[in-house]
């Protein structure tokens, strides 16, 4: 479980503690007010901040590598929707968190990273210009000083929420223990511009949808952030439309008419139905190359309208309407009458359990051509074995092609991908720890590859410490599978793409977990037995999967790139 220190009782006429009455303490007090948890790793630059918080019993989870400080906070936000907070020391500590900070920026995660920084007198031999480094990743840095410590910390949280982006709050080393001074005036934060719905756009889109024979609605994370999924489902139900989501909004509609995740993770029989749509309304999703299967998700004849309140990235052939999402969808709902008959009447099988389960064309043999387990068969079996009330967290790597396709989740905040925006691996253990803190009542399931697992291995211990009940599934092909299928298949030498076999179950046991190695589907029974008898603890399942089975999204990518 997450460790927090015990609050020290106050004593009469006690000497002032070193973490009281200074800039770091003021920042800490605002963090305690604005965030529900702090994720970090202590060093010279943030020790006073952390001490102030842990002394008072504020929830704090320590990472073992700074990369996990931000990935924990990132995943905490994705699992709860609340703003998150992380902290590192200056220099090397900040640099270690840079990849996960860039991921948070590209994934549009509102969090505040409180970082120690160089003193105001200038860079020391072991400092870097952290503000410039953050700017290179598109992240704004604010600086806490004696005259603005409280106000600027509030500003950092406000800015993160308004822009849906990470913000760095720097505490210069020589100011951390400085006493507060006369408050400096702080200009009000400019209001975020509104994008009201144009009535002409509403009338036109409502007419297009009402006139469609096979309407489909695709929702992304933007629809979740706008709290627009309920009215959007209302629009779909009136039209008799089918639904799809982005991976970050999985199961947002909670509807039997949901075809699942759009893009490279779409099941083949569901894809066949989706491609029949004649009008598609895309709400709060980017329609990037992965979502559109490199432009093949829908045929060219499909009319696509994309609604979002962010600038148009210019991807795909969709007509773009910039508008605040929820008001726009509520306006549509008022304009669309109930339709009959509908597309749903012509495809009743979509709502049936048989359609939502494995399709005969996807039925997988137990083993791949090399005699190791077929990952499709493994993950399909795990969907039946793992508790239904689960959070599924994924690291990055070739293996991501199977978990989103075969593992169901109870709500859109239970499918967590950290690393995909920046195309990074190694963030799994930290992300899973953040999810365990955010949703302790659920079983946290981390699905990782062996390459990413080894990269982030230091924070397996963090995951064990932060998790009430969890399962680590390592889909272990003894390789960097993505590179193997993209480049070795073209004749490049594979030596650097291969990894000597590692027994992650043994590593987990050494750190206090239970676990086993699986070479057959029958070996998954050990996990099933453990789940039946344990309400707490972590189980590490190392699955020896085939190097010869290629994920569908990877095959699409290779084909698109030629």
Model regions: which residues?
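N-terminal alpha/beta PP-like core and its mobile active-site loop of ThDP/TPP-dependent enzymes
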Residues: 2-339, 388, 469-472
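Phosphate/pyrophosphate-binding active-site segments
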Residues: 2-19, 23, 167-171, 182-184, ...
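Active-site diphosphate/adenylate-binding microenvironment
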Residues: 23-24, 32-34, 41-44, 49-54, ...
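Small/polar loops that bind or transfer phosphate-bearing groups
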Residues: 41, 64, 88-89, 144, ...
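Short acidic/His/Gly/Ser-rich catalytic and metal-binding motifs that mark active-site loops
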Residues: 49, 177-181, 252-255, 355-358, ...
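A general structural motif
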Residues: 65, 123-126, 192-206, 262-265, ...
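Active-site flanking residues adjacent to catalytic metal/cofactor-binding acidic residues
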Residues: 116, 283, 307-308, 394, ...
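Thiamine diphosphate
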Residues: 122-123, 313-314, 322, 329-330, ...
């Amino acid at each position: 479980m997450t460790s927090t220190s015990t609050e020290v009782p106050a004593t009469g006429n006690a000497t002032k503690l070193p973490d009281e009455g200074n800039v770091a303490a003021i920042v800490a007090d605002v963090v305690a007010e604005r965030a529900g948890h702090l994720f970090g790793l202590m060093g010279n630059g943030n020790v006073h901040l952390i001490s102030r918080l842990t002394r008072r019993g504020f929830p704090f989870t320590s990472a073992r590598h700074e990369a996990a400080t931000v990935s924990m906070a990132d995943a905490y936000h994705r699992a709860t929707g609340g703003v998150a907070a992380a902290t590192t020391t200056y220099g090397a500590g900040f640099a270690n968190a840079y990849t996960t900070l860039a991921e948070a920026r590209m994934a549009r995660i509102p969090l505040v990273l409180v970082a120690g920084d160089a003193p105001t007198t200038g860079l020391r031999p072991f400092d870097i210009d952290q503000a410039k480094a953050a700017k290179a990743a598109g992240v704004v840095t604010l600086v806490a000083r004696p005259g603005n410590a409280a106000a600027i910390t509030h500003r950092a949280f406000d800015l993160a929420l308004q822009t849906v982006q990470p913000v760095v709050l720097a505490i210069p080393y020589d100011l951390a223990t400085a006493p507060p001074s006369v408050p400096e005036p702080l200009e009000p934060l400019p209001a975020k511009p509104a994008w009201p719905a144009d009535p002409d756009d509403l009338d036109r889109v409502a007419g297009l949808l009402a006139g469609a024979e096979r309407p489909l609605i695709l929702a992304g994370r933007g629809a979740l952030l706008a709290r627009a999924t309920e009215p959007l489902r209302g629009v779909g139900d009136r039209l008799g439309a089918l639904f799809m989501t982005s991976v970050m909004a999985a199961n947002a509609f909670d509807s039997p008419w949901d075809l699942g995740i759009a893009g490279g993770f779409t099941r083949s029989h569901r894809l066949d139905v989706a491609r029949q749509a004649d009008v598609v309304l895309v709400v709060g999703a980017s329609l990037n190359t992965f979502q559109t299967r490199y432009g093949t998700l829908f045929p060219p004849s499909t009319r696509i309208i994309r609604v979002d309140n962010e600038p148009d990235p210019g991807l795909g052939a969709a007509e773009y309407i910039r508008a605040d999402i929820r008001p726009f969808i509520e306006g549509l709902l008022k304009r669309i009458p109930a339709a009959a008959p509908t597309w749903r009447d012509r495809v009743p099988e979509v709502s049936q359990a048989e359609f939502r389960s494995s399709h005969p064309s996807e039925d997988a043999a137990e083993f791949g051509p090399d005699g190791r387990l077929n990952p499709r068969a493994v993950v399909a079996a795990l969907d039946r074995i793992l508790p239904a009330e689960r959070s599924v967290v994924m690291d990055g790597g070739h293996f991501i092609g199977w978990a989103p396709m075969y593992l169901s989740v109870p709500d859109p905040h239970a499918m967590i991908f950290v690393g995909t925006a920046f195309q990074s691996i190694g963030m799994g253990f930290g992300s899973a720890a953040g999810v365990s803190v955010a949703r302790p009542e659920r079983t946290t399931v981390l699905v990782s590859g062996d390459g990413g697992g080894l990269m982030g291995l230091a924070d397996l211990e963090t995951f064990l410490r932060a998790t009430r009940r969890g399962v680590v599934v390592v889909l272990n092909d003894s390789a960097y599978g993505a590179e193997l299928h993209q480049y070795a298949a073209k004749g490049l030498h594979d030596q650097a793409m291969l990894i000597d076999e590692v027994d992650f179950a043994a590593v987990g046991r050494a750190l206090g977990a239970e676990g086993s190695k699986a070479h057959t589907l029958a070996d998954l029974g050990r996990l099933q037995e453990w789940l039946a008898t344990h309400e707490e603890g972590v189980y590490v399942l190392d699955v020896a999967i085939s190097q010869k089975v290629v994920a569908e999204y990877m095959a699409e990518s290779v084909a698109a790139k030629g």
